[in-house]
């Protein structure tokens, strides 16, 4: 279902609150790797929609525990017998082709769906808002969800992180709106039928999957062009080989554009003009200005440039320098009102990159017609996302913070955010994620690690990842020392880490536990226990 004129006042409420996946046989749906952050969200949505769900995972974790409490049967360990009763078997790109359950499913002619396939089924007859990007997509999706929750927009939400407001990574809503974080690592975002496509940022991560940086940019371009409407950073530069991440200006103005992909954009963002278009219309800008970082929140003003548009003649009427393009009926005249939303407070946020995330969320809200009061309330009540610059503990005025960053640009953004709230030392407890990523960005990692005051390296995640010559943590340590950075150690013991922190920190210092793996998260909590005697 493609809805072009879609605002809050004309939301179509589903006659049935349950998902209706006619393409999938009724029966047991078995999810391989059900404890993963994305797969667990799918499992819960299906379960809450009265589908019979079971699954398996190599080991138990918090997601597995949560799903088991809901009554979902989960096998620990993979075994061909696990899928005997299943009609449908779901897997993700993380599951190898020789997985015993996947092999058994093929041999027994089970219906097999990739994660993107089951998502496509879930999204049938939904108005889909898909948030993708190299970084920032989880936080942006969570901010949109918070605005929805405070504007009576009862959307279904599927996100790749634990939202603190839900203590969960999914929610089954009653409206036809579905908000989803769209994974770019395996091109899942290209299989999602998005009505609104949101890009948060683009960098050269996942080069092993895509082959070249141009392929990454082309994939995001396809993502935009497949949607009815696109929201993306002003300087995302899909066709720019030099820099494609969000660029923050020097004057404190952070633009985000709202752009309908059937026109040529004002900025070179790789959106091709569709055949139905007969002229170029510039995009609307949504900007943040007068930005103030507080202790655990950011306050700013939102500037919205708009114009009136007569789609019957494809000629902008009384447009400002940057103009809005909304998907309307062929004869309708509308306007995106130029205005300022003063004193927006984004709670539980530190760092200018969070402002960009908020602007993307605000842009979605504007597109859907959510009023300014509800937008402000949703961001004020934003509770954050687990492991996204999350405070683990504050011990003797030394803050222990964990963050999911694992790409060099993400680690640098996390470090910059920490520098913005302290003049003290910053210690990085860093768990590199995958040897291939270390190989691809070795020099960048070295450059950024040298920006810390101290670095403690922990073993590469995941532990089963095949080592690459020259990319071990010993090699990282050696490279740092050879470049004159001697404040680096290798540790994998919370007691040793806690002793080091106690001996090396003073009031006002910050310790960052950085990485996407479970080991660094475990170390963060165990370190707190050793330092404070309090379990968390």
UniProtKB/Swiss-Prot annotation:
Known function: Cell wall formation.
MF terms (GO), sorted A to Z: ATP binding; UDP-N-acetylmuramate-L-alanine ligase activity
BP GO annotations: cell division; cell wall organization; peptidoglycan biosynthetic process; regulation of cell shape
Pathway linked to the protein: Cell wall biogenesis; peptidoglycan biosynthesis
Name of encoding gene: murC
Name of the top EC class for this enzyme: ligase
Keywords, alphabetical: ATP-binding, Cell cycle, Cell division, Cell shape, Cell wall biogenesis/degradation, Cytoplasm, Ligase, Nucleotide-binding, Peptidoglycan synthesis
UniProt subcellular location: Cytoplasm
Catalytic reaction equation(s): UDP-N-acetyl-alpha-D-muramate + L-alanine + ATP = UDP-N-acetyl-alpha-D-muramoyl-L-alanine + ADP + phosphate + H(+)
UniProt keyword Cell wall biogenesis/degradation, yes or no: yes
One Pfam family here: Mur_ligase_M
Lineage of origin: Bacteria, Pseudomonadati, Pseudomonadota, Alphaproteobacteria, Rickettsiales
Enzyme Commission number: 6.3.2.8
Family designation: Belongs to the MurCDEF family.
GO cellular component, one term: cytoplasm
Coiled-coil annotated residue ranges, if any: none
Annotated protein name in UniProt: UDP-N-acetylmuramate--L-alanine ligase
Ligand binding (ATP): 133-139
Record carries keyword Ligase: yes
Primary location class: cytoplasm
């Amino acid at each position: 279902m493609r809805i072009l004129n879609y605002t809050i006042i004309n939301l179509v409420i589903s006659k049935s609150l349950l998902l209706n996946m006619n393409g999938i046989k009724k029966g047991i749906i078995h999810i391989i790797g059900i404890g993963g952050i994305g797969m667990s969200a799918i499992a819960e949505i299906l379960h809450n929609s009265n589908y019979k769900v079971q699954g398996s995972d190599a080991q138990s974790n918090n997601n597995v525990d949560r799903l088991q409490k809901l009554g979902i049967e989960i096998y620990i360990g993979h075994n061909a017998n696990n899928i005997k009763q299943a009609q449908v078997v779901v897997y993700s790109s993380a599951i190898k082709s020789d997985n015993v359950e996947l092999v058994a499913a093929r041999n027994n002619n089970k219906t097999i769906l990739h994660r993107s396939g089951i998502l496509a089924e879930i999204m049938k007859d939904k108005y889909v808002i898909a948030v993708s990007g190299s970084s920032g997509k989880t936080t942006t999706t969570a901010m949109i969800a918070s605005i929805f929750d405070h504007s009576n927009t009862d959307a279904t939400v599927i996100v790749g992180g634990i939202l603190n407001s839900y203590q969960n990574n999914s929610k089954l809503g009653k409206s036809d709106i579905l908000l989803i974080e769209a994974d770019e690592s395996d091109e899942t975002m290209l299989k999602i039928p998005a009505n609104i496509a949101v890009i948060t940022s683009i960098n050269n991560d996942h080069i092993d999957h895509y082959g070249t940086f141009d392929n990454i940019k082309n994939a995001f371009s396809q993502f935009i062009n497949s949607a009815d409407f696109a929201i993306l950073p002003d300087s995302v530069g899909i066709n720019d080989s030099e820099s494609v991440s969000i660029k923050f200006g020097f004057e404190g103005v952070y633009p985000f554009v709202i752009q309908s992909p059937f026109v040529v954009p004002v900025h070179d963002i790789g959106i091709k003009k569709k055949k139905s278009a007969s002229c170029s219309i510039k995009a609307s800008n949504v900007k943040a200005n007068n930005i103030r970082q507080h202790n655990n929140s950011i306050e700013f003003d939102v500037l919205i440039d708009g114009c009136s548009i007569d789609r019957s003649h494809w000629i902008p009427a009384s447009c400002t320098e940057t103009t809005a393009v909304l998907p309307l009926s062929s004869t309708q005249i509308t306007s995106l009102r130029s205005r300022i939303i003063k004193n927006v407070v984004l709670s539980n946020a530190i760092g200018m990159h969070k402002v960009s995330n908020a602007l993307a969320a605000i842009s979605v809200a504007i597109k859907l017609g959510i009023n300014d009061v509800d937008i402000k309330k949703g961001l004020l009540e934003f509770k954050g996302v687990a492991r996204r610059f999350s405070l683990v503990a504050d011990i003797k005025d030394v803050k222990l913070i964990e963050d999911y960053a694992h790409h060099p640009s993400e680690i640098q953004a996390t470090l910059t955010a920490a520098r913005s709230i302290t003049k003290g030392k910053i210690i990085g407890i860093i768990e590199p994620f995958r040897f291939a990523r270390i190989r691809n960005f070795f020099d960048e990692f070295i450059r950024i690690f040298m920006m810390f005051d101290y670095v403690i390296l922990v073993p590469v995640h995941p532990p089963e990842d095949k080592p690459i010559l020259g990319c071990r943590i010993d090699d990282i340590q050696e490279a740092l020392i050879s470049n004159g950075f001697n404040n680096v150690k290798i540790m994998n013991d919370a007691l040793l880490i806690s002793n080091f922190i106690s001996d090396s920190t003073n009031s006002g210092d910050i310790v960052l536990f950085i990485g996407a793996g479970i080991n660094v998260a475990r170390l963060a909590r165990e370190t707190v226990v050793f330092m404070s005697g309090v379990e968390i």
